[in-house]
Amino acid sequence: MSEDKLKALRKQIDEIDEKLVPLFCKRMDTSLSVALYKKENGMPIFDAEREKAILDSLSESAGKYKGYASVLYGTLMDLSRALQHDVIDSAGAVPAEETVRFDASLPCHVACFGREGAYAHIAACSIFKAAEIEFFPTFADTADALLRDDRFDYAVMPVENSTAGSVLEVYDLLINNPLYIVAGIEIPVIHCLLGVSGAAESSVKTVYSHKQALSQCSEFIKAHGMQQVEELSTAAAAFRVSQEDDVHVGAIASKLAASQYGLEVIKEGIQNTSNNSTRFVALSRKLSSSDDADKISIVFSLDHRPGTLYRTLARFAALGLNLTKIESRPKHAGKFEYMFYLDFTGNIDREETWRLLSALKNEMQDFKVLGNYRDRGVNIN
């Protein structure tokens, strides 16, 4: 193909686009008129059966481009629906009665996963400045304390590690219980080999730690031929070593755990990668908001049809919302059905953002705002 031929074809596409843009604008204007009619007559925005019938008909008429047409018109319908929500859901930002204001400086009672000296303990102390902290051995116990005991205002647990991935059990607790994220913090993970006085790298034959910490230090463990034993947390491992008082056992934990349980740091920084950090979240029984909140976490499910996820994500793009994480998780109730976890930058006090979330909630069977919170960077203190 000659360069002149390519230029001619591109010019033809440009001419087609020039015709499409006015038609797109006209379609959106008409959609606005439909929204006003629906608002005046108390009609719902979303009519799933009608949209499916129209989409199927338009796709079939596209012949060999059926699949492409389905994505195109599906996206157009989603954008039109979003525009209609702007008209009908005109109440503005999130209603005040649906959220509480979060203030980490106030005295509070916190349920924390693990033991004194664990990374979760470091996270809790970094988030809350005047907290009474109580520790629990499992994620379920920590969540249960917050849910069932009114003495607790918050709970702190890990949700993601930069090398080991998401802590799926915590995400499951979030979706299956009335729990909401109110703060997030990223803590650098500097794993140390801890032991009693007199212990050395050469003397330690068995190492205790949480399963994720063992995974993150797998190269060091393998190189030294150590046996691995899982504990509920890194701090629990340190406590066990302090109780056994044996130079042949060691724990993988933090320097704080060493000082907490009277152990020595045999070697510092034994993790596989130096760029290792864990993201922790503070949870509450109520959805919160704050002026400096910069991240929103949601979870939802979609019909198992081609293009549904793409179309959903396109609505975030249309508002200029930056997605920072998306992950799928199998639904317990359905075979080959999935929940999607999504993080994006934003604040629900922004009117357009709240309208989008309200629209998605109305259109999806399973939808939950997990939280709107400030997500702090790596804490080096």
Task: Label every PLM stretch briefly.
Residues 1-381:
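Domain-level signature for soluble enzymes in the chorismate/prephenate branch of the shikimate pathway
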